[in-house]
Every structure is written in structure tokens, then in C-alpha cells.
From Swiss-Prot:
Transmembrane keyword on record: no
Subunit structure: Monomer.
GO process terms (BP): queuosine biosynthetic process; tRNA wobble guanine modification
EC supergroup of this enzyme: transferase
Provenance organism: Coxiella burnetii (strain CbuG_Q212) (Coxiella burnetii (strain Q212))
UniProt-listed Gene3D superfamilies: QueA-like
Catalytic activity: 7-aminomethyl-7-carbaguanosine(34) in tRNA + S-adenosyl-L-methionine = epoxyqueuosine(34) in tRNA + adenine + L-methionine + 2 H(+)
UniProt xrefs under NCBIfam families: PRK00147.1, queA
Protein name (record): S-adenosylmethionine:tRNA ribosyltransferase-isomerase
Pathway(s) where this gene product acts: tRNA modification; tRNA-queuosine biosynthesis
Keyword Endoplasmic reticulum applies: no
A GO molecular function held by the record: S-adenosylmethionine:tRNA ribosyltransferase-isomerase activity
Length: 343
């Protein structure tokens, strides 16, 4: 194992036409690349092959965050255009946001949305602005009236009505994410029925995915990278389900890198403990996993923290080999793309 990992170690060549621009007609119609760590093999399947790999007493853990229409367009008092991406809702009228304008807004300046809603800039924290909405409506009301789904930057088109449904898991409950936990997008009701018939248990954590998930790693060395913060919650019910799974010799299966980060954040000294708060856990090769036994995930961007996490779990050489095979076999990549299972 290398002592000094570099961002460039996680680069790979991806033809642009393999980046999925739209979802498949059938949520569960994706392909599945399966990595067996013990045998060091890579095989090609359909997504229903995921259920085939689940065993009785396994615990499938999903992220129930709900994507909000976090993109707002407005203007300054001077008339200049402003684009606002809500990163985190702090209260009914207070939130943190990324703001794009011809000039960075000053503290105390105003942004007008839809001619009726006034937002005042009250603070700045690195790339984020703290904003207050002056209205009888809440920020969520404003977003659901005038916001739009913030598709990832690699989807080169405007969001449409299909995205409102398809860039959302069918089990989304808790509003607050600006990006979907994409491994969960493959699940439909038939998937859940099949899991229950296999004798698997199902439970949910929450991690509100932030825009930082798309930010590039700017440091050359991973040791110098500062991970973005995201809000998460692992309940006592989840911890109890994990304890029961262990008692019955089952496996904990994380559906997505967000679930992985939740569970590994909440596990201390071999025990999952209830936790609600921030996580900036950065998982890369050399990390000692304490909770998760199998991971279902999508394919991730070159040099991204998500790919680094997958390499940490699946083994660097095996995962990078699998990515090369995925490219050769024309898998669909990123949010609307195909899936990978590592066990």
C-alpha cells in the first residue's frame, strides 16, 4: 500500500459519450459491474444481479435524503443577474448558498427573486454566503415555487419535468440535498419486494448531499485535501438494526458512498452509535473500515473523492481495472449511469 497517494493516481480516460445524459426508461434496467474482492474477479450483470447477491439476514442501508429544487435565479438591486444555489437550509428563513454573479455580492446587499422575494446577504464563509429571506414564506416554499433541480455539471442540458421524478429516489423523505444519492436511483418497488423475499432487512440513514460532492480535488497530495462538510443522521433504530444483523451473521450493505460515510462516521470502537451532525470524513486507500461489508455505487468522476472511497473499499488496482473494463464494455457513467457492486 502506498504511503503517499496523489490525486493523479485516480485519473482514468473516459470518452464523453459514455456520460449518461438521461436516465433509462426503467429505473432498474441498468447494468451492474460486480467486483468480488475475495476472488479478485470482475463480472458483468444486470442490476437485478444485486438482489441475487443479497443473502438472508443481510441489512441493506439506504440514504433517504430528498433533493430540493435548490437553483434560484434573480437579480441585484442594480439589475445584474444572480444565480443562487442553496447548499444548506439553516432555519425557516436562513440558508447557506453558492452565489454566481458578475461581481461577488457584498454583505448587506440584496437579491430579488421572482420580483416578490427579497434575500439579504448577511455573512460569508469561504465559498458560501449566509442569506436571509425576508418574506412570510419559508425558503422551502420559495424553492418549491421558483427553484429548479440542480443537475450535475456533467449533464449538458437544462433540467426538465422528467428530472423532477427521476433525479430523486422513490424512498426520498427528508428534504435537504442538492444532489441525489445516485446508487438509490436504481431501486423500484420490485427491488424492495425482492429484497424482502430474500429475507434481508432494510433501513435508512440521512446525509444531505451538498454541491461539494462535485468539487474537484485541488491538492496534489490526498493528505492535503480538505473535505467538504455535510449534515447526516444515523438513528438508534439504524444502530439496533446493525447490531441485530451482526448477531445473525449478516452483512451490512451500503447503498451509495453517502451511506458508507454515514456508517463509518457513526461507528466507534466497532459499535455503531446514534449521531446527528456534521461529517467531513474523507475515505481513501489506507482507511480502516469498521462497519460496511458490501457497497453498491455508481461510477464516479476521475480524480474525485468518491472514486477514492471506492478504491479504498474495493482495492485500488482491482477498482481501477474494473473501471477500465467498464469503459471497454461501454457502461454508462455517473449519476444517470450504471451501477457497481463490491463485496
Amino acid at each position: 500500500m502506498k504511503n503517499q497517494w496523489k490525486t493523479s493516481d485516480f485519473d482514468y480516460n473516459l470518452p464523453v459519450e459514455l456520460i449518461a445524459q438521461r436516465p433509462l426508461a426503467d429505473r432498474s434496467g441498468s447494468r451492474l459491474l460486480y467486483i468480488d474482492r475475495s476472488r479478485r474477479t470482475v463480472s458483468h450483470r444486470q442490476f437485478n444481479g444485486f438482489v441475487e447477491q443479497v443473502k438472508p439476514n443481510d441489512l441493506v442501508v439506504l440514504n433517504d435524503t430528498k433533493v430540493i429544487p435548490a437553483g434560484l435565479f434573480g437579480h441585484k438591486q442594480t439589475g445584474g443577474k444572480v444565480e443562487c444555489l442553496v447548499e444548506r437550509i439553516l432555519s425557516k428563513d436562513r440558508f447557506l448558498a453558492h452565489i454566481r454573479a458578475s461581481k461577488a455580492p457584498k454583505l448587506g446587499s440584496q437579491i430579488i427573486i421572482a420580483d416578490n422575494f427579497k434575500i439579504i446577504i448577511e455573512g460569508r464563509y469561504n465559498d458560501l454566503f449566509e442569506c436571509v429571506l425576508h418574506s412570510s414564506a419559508s425558503i422551502l416554499d420559495l424553492l418549491y415555487q421558483h427553484g429548479r433541480i440542480p443537475l450535475p455539471p456533467y449533464i449538458q442540458r437544462e433540467p426538465d419535468k422528467d428530472d423532477q421524478a427521476r433525479y430523486q429516489t422513490i424512498f426520498a423523505e427528508r428534504a435537504g440535498a442538492v444532489a441525489a444519492p445516485t446508487a438509490g436511483l436504481h431501486f423500484n418497488e420490485e427491488t424492495f419486494d425482492a429484497l424482502r423475499k430474500k429475507g434481508a432487512a432494510i433501513t435508512y440513514v440521512t446525509l444531505h448531499v451538498g454541491a461539494g460532492t462535485f468539487q474537484p480535488v485541488r491538492a496534489d497530495s490526498l493528505a492535503d485535501h480538505r473535505m467538504h462538510h455535510e449534515w447526516m443522521e444515523v438513528s438508534k433504530a439504524v444502530c439496533d438494526a446493525i447490531a441485530k444483523c451482526r448477531k445473525n451473521n449478516g452483512r451490512v450493505i451500503a447503498v451509495g458512498t453517502t451511506v458508507m460515510r454515514c456508517l463509518e462516521t457513526a461507528t466507534k470502537n466497532g459499535e455503531c452509535r446514534p449521531y446527528a451532525g456534521e461529517t467531513d470524513l474523507f475515505i481513501y486507500p489506507g482507511f480502516q473500515f469498521k462497519c460496511v461489508d458490501a457497497l453498491l455505487t455508481n461510477f464516479h468522476l476521475p480524480k474525485s473523492t468518491l472514486l477514492m472511497l471506492v478504491c479504498a473499499f474495493g482495492g485500488y488496482e482491482l477498482v481501477m481495472e474494473a473501471y477500465q473494463k467498464a469503459v471497454e464494455n461501454r457502461y454508462r457513467f455517473f449519476s444517470y449511469g450504471d451501477a457497481m457492486l463490491i463485496s
